[in-house]
Amino acid sequence: MKVLVPVKRLIDYNVKARVKSDGSGVDLANVKMSMNPFDEIAVEEAIRLKEKGQAEEIIAVSIGVKQAAETLRTALAMGADRAILVVAADDVQQDIEPLAVAKILAAVARAEGTELIIAGKQAIDNDMNATGQMLAAILGWAQATFASKVEIEGAKAKVTREVDGGLQTIAVSLPAVVTADLRLNEPRYASLPNIMKAKKKPLDEKTAADYGVDVAPRLEVVSVREPEGRKAGIKVGSVDELVGKLKEAGVI
């Protein structure tokens, strides 16, 4: 079974993002970039399936700028077998929209004969949480989102999901799309020997045009702004003073 894992290059989650002065977006100049954390979890899960003998090959795919090759090398160092970089933008500020990403991934999955796609549930830069669902719809495959546990049983995948008030376990027929939640696993660190080996693993470069997909944006970002700072609180000396302050604020 071939497993396809999409990975996205974005601002490292330890870095505090800065909004551009004109409010047009996030400033990516001289900022450390890394793999989307949910995608790291997806890569790890694919590797674990291979270690169990349930996957034959893991293909990592990234869609965006050429610099995303670094992100793919990370996936290869973790344990992916080969990678495909689909160059769909020249400007690092351009974020390829979920629908275009889903269309490209669907084309890659068909070309590669993939039976399982494991993706992060969302990217932490835009929090769209849409690509996996769109991808399943385009392919006409079953989908299991927000997975906290994945088990392959013959021609089916049994997926446990966290829902309000408990856990839900569903079984989906393969081929399928699974999106990874935070509690699915703890991703491994790539060892130095594996980082060196990753440089020799295949990394093919394609373009969106190779798959016949138009990546022109359909959404317009009107403005981006940082969250408002939290106002300092005050200490009150008595219950009466607290009640008075609440009345002043119009709470009671």
UniProtKB/Swiss-Prot annotation:
Keyword flag Cell cycle: no
Coiled-coil ranges (or none): none
Database matches in Gene3D superfamilies: HUPs
Keywords on record: Electron transport, FAD, Flavoprotein, Transport
Cofactor: FAD; AMP
Gene Ontology molecular function, alphabetical: electron transfer activity
Pfam families named among the record's database cross-references: ETF (PF01012)
Record's signal peptide: none
InterPro entries: ET-Flavoprotein_bsu_CS, ETF_a/b_N, ETF_b, ETF_beta_N, Rossmann-like_a/b/a_fold
SMART domains in UniProt: ETF
Binding note for cofactor: Binds 1 FAD per dimer.
Highest taxon, organism lineage: Bacteria
Function: The electron transfer flavoprotein serves as a specific electron acceptor for other dehydrogenases. It transfers the electrons to the main respiratory chain via ETF-ubiquinone oxidoreductase (ETF dehydrogenase).
Family: Belongs to the ETF beta-subunit/FixA family.
Subunit structure comment from the entry: Heterodimer of an alpha and a beta subunit.
Protein name per its UniProtKB record: Electron transfer flavoprotein subunit beta
